[in-house]
């Protein structure tokens, strides 16, 4: 009996310790579960659960697959705007491109933060819009000191993707009013592979295009108003979403005023100095005329060096052509003055030749009339003898006229002739002193009114 009682005691003790151990294990599990509920999930575990291999997320498939298209809201912040080249017709810009869309697969509630800023390397793990710049000629990413990219995920599944880019974009220019022109350069954002059934781009409602404070351009004034438009593209492969922004750039002509207009104006005025130089100073006037013509030609060539070879006439071409015409006309004016002033020599030479011919002709005529007078006398005597004298008289009581001898004006002396032609040449110089500046002033009035006022207003009306 003692042995049985001892055995029962051992069995009851065993069950007691087993129950105690079981209770301790249950308490430990409850404590661990309570701790797990109170302690947040680690970021690594959360990301693995959200977009890891075990999450079932596939970056190759767009959100809302086989459903409504994904709406991507775009925003651009311009850091710098410059390097506008007329020869290649493009411009260079540095921007922050920001895209926002909703991916329901990335919505979460397990993590306490409202948003997560992820490393750029995570971009390969999620779906992204296939945006590209339709009028892009060259582009660069920025990797100093690290990739200039931002990825932010919000609780409701919204995704913000920002990237810094330097772009060279084409900008077809109309240079008819150069350098008083206003250019419109566009930036087109388009989907490369997704049609509008899958993806739609749209501008952000508030401040879709922002410009860095204090941004200035060396030759242009970037206007505050920017046109935001939709430019949906239709190709053989489908209809693709496209949005664009138009930048209006008004050229500041201060550089061209100093480098082109004022120097050419001074060259034209310098060519008028020859009108005040004595006409006998041929070397001085010819040298001045040729120098101004060559300088004007060089100036005209320089104005076209930085411009493309276009088929139409630009405003600067008209200015340079008219200035060259005035300078060349001033040189021709001296040629006319010199020609007129030397005409008395030619006239004297012509008179000498004519005088010699006239004297020879007069002698011949004198001898001819002498022979005729002798014959007439003989005839008169013979007719009178037969009573026919009155027949030699004219009818109606008119007497016959003798040979015509017009009254000849005495020719002027060589000095008088020289003075007449020199006065004519001086008169040409005197008229040129007034006519050339007046004609150039009239041209300036028409030129600046047409290009700076009338055409400028037409351009603004077209843009509005």
Swiss-Prot record:
Tell me what reaction this enzyme catalyses: chloride(in) = chloride(out)
Q: List the disulfide bonds.
A: 171-185, 231-242
- Give all Phosphoserine modified positions: 370, 379
Task: Read off the Gene3D superfamilies from this record.
Answer: Neurotransmitter-gated ion-channel ligand-binding domain (2.70.170.10), Neurotransmitter-gated ion-channel transmembrane domain (1.20.58.390)
The superkingdom listed in its UniProt entry is: Eukaryota
Post-translational changes noted in the entry:
Phosphorylated by PKA; this causes down-regulation of channel activity.
Cytoplasmic-side positions: 278-282, 336-430
Q: What is this protein called?
A: Glycine receptor subunit alpha-3
Q: Which organism is it from?
A: Homo sapiens (Human)
């Amino acid at each position: 009996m003692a042995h049985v009682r001892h055995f029962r005691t051992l069995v009851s003790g065993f069950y007691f310790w087993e129950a105690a151990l079981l209770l301790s294990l249950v308490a430990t599990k409850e404590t661990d579960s309570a701790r797990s509920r109170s302690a947040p999930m680690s970021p690594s575990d959360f990301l693995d659960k959200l977009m890891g291999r075990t999450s079932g997320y596939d970056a190759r498939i767009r959100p809302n697959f086989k459903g409504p298209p994904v709406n991507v809201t775009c925003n651009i912040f311009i850091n710098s705007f410059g390097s506008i080249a007329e020869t290649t017709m493009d411009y260079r810009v540095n921007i922050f491109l920001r895209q926002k869309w909703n991916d329901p697969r990335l919505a979460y509630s397990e993590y306490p933060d409202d948003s997560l800023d992820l490393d750029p390397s995570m971009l390969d793990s999620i779906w992204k819009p296939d945006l590209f710049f339709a009028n892009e000629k060259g582009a660069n990413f920025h990797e100093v000191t690290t990739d200039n990219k931002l990825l932010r995920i919000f609780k409701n599944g919204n995704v913000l993707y920002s990237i810094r880019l330097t772009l060279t974009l084409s900008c077809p220019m109309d240079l008819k009013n150069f350098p008083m022109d206003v250019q419109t350069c566009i930036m087109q954002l388009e989907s490369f592979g997704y049609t509008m059934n899958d993806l739609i781009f749209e501008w952000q409602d508030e401040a879709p295009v922002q410009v860095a404070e204090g941004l200035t351009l060396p030759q242009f004034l970037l206007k505050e108003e920017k046109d935001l438009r939709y430019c949906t593209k239709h190709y053989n492969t489908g209809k693709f979403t496209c949005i664009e922004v138009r930048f209006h750039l008004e050229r500041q002509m201060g550089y061209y005023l100093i480098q082109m207009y004022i120097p050419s104006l001074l060259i034209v005025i310098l060519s008028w100095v020859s009108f005040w130089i004595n006409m006998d100073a041929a070397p001085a006037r010819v040298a001045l005329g040729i120098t101004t013509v060559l300088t004007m030609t060089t100036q005209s060539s320089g104005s076209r060096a930085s411009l493309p070879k276009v088929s139409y006439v630009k405003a600067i071409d008209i200015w340079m052509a008219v200035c060259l015409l005035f300078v060349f006309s001033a040189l021709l004016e001296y040629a006319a003055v010199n020609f007129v002033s030397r005409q008395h020599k030619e006239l004297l030479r012509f008179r000498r030749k004519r005088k010699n011919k006239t004297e020879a002709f007069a002698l011949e005529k004198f001898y001819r009339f002498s022979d005729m007078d002798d014959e007439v006398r003989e005839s008169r005597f013979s007719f009178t003898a037969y009573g026919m004298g009155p027949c030699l008289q004219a009818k109606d009581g008119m007497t016959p006229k003798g040979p015509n001898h017009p009254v000849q004006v005495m020719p002027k002396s060589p000095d008088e002739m020289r003075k007449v032609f020199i006065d004519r040449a001086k008169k040409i110089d005197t008229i040129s002193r007034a006519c050339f500046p007046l004609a150039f002033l009239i041209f300036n009035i028409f030129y600046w009114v047409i290009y700076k006022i009338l055409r400028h207003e037409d351009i603004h009306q077209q843009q509005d």
